[in-house]
């Protein structure tokens, strides 16, 4: 039997074997047996080297034709097997179109949204209005009008997400403070909840995207005593118990004097943990009396008007309330975590 006859014999055998395949796995095995690297057709072609030039041309051309025919037949057989499998499944399966649908599970508000609404209600009871502002801000509203100097570290690329047009993702809800000072005439009391962004290394207590509530009161004869009293009312109503706090000096360009309001870590009861960085205290609320330059920039006379401002971190507040040890859970989208609230 010469090579041409051997090719015909292999082709007939391949058609018979491939055509009798009962599954895609069986088809793949038969395919490899004939046109795989170690297949029968491949083995025959290795003997072509011993033929004359004319015979090489004839046998090579025939081998290519048979190989293409087999590829086409394999493809058709695969389609046929898939169709038979689908028909078998369709015949064996039954779907009752009259069966009542399963009741969809109820959704719920994100824990941060829940506490935001609760805080809004608390401040509404104290005469505060709720304001809003864009997440994409100008450099002026986010920094300049808040008394940040041109060389302030917060303006640098490693701390702030800048856009190509020079705008930025707001780094604090204090930017809404600027818009409010231009929009409203004092006296007024406002809070401004929203999402903020900072280019930070993410860990158990830091996220690049988080939530704040900015608060601001502008009027006459506003003092630090008014600020402290407001914060005490807020914390006692949020946690429904006395919370150990401490007020320490802090520097923020838009307030003078500035304070840091810390609360005893409720995750570890002040003993030290990754959330409070083993200190037992958690920075919750930077605050202070509004800087005269901020009032002047808004067209208000700081000799006539005074006020206080604060920025409350909602993520950390929720962590303290529920004893959550990692801020990253809030942005994870993990339903097992979120369904607990």
UniProtKB/Swiss-Prot annotation:
Binds 2 magnesium ions per tetramer. One of its GO terms (cellular component) is cytoplasm. Keywords: Aminoacyl-tRNA synthetase, ATP-binding, Cytoplasm, Ligase, Magnesium, Metal-binding, Nucleotide-binding, Protein biosynthesis. It catalyses: tRNA(Phe) + L-phenylalanine + ATP = L-phenylalanyl-tRNA(Phe) + AMP + diphosphate + H(+). Its cofactor is Mg(2+). The keyword Metal-binding applies. It is found in: Cytoplasm. GO terms for biological process: phenylalanyl-tRNA aminoacylation. NCBIfam families: pheS (TIGR00468). Belongs to the class-II aminoacyl-tRNA synthetase family. Phe-tRNA synthetase alpha subunit type 1 subfamily. Tetramer of two alpha and two beta subunits. This is Phenylalanine--tRNA ligase alpha subunit. The gene is pheS.
